[in-house]
Amino acid sequence: MALLVSAYKSAKKDELYLFVPKEDGLEKLSDELLVMFGEPQHVIDFDLTEKRKLARVDAEEVKKALETKGYFMQMPPSEIEKMGDMPPPPEHLDNIF
């Protein structure tokens, strides 16, 4: 069964996202969480299903968090994760062939 979800991005930190059930909106979130997150900027509403592909997290993990906590916060990728998309340094290129 699909769950209609709203996604928000943080105005304070790049690549920090908050997912909440659309029917609840942001009203049920604590003031502390919203202060830490910063001004939420609405990105998209979508149906969350088990088969839904999300960028950096498993849909089932998001669904469980929404059911238990009422929200899911997707943290920015770590510096190591970001480096995974970078080409190897030039000194390592001689080993390619």
UniProtKB/Swiss-Prot annotation:
Task: Extract the InterPro entries matched here.
Answer: YcgL-like_sf, YcgL_dom
**Residues annotated as domain YcgL:** 3-87
Q: Where is this region: Disordered?
A: 78-97
Q: Which PROSITE patterns match?
A: YCGL
Source organism, top-level taxon: Bacteria
Pfam families to which the protein is assigned, alphabetical = YcgL
Q: By what name is this protein known?
A: YcgL domain-containing protein Tcr_0238
Q: What is the organism field in this record?
A: Hydrogenovibrio crunogenus (strain DSM 25203 / XCL-2)
List the top taxonomic levels of the source.
Bacteria, Pseudomonadati, Pseudomonadota, Gammaproteobacteria, Thiotrichales
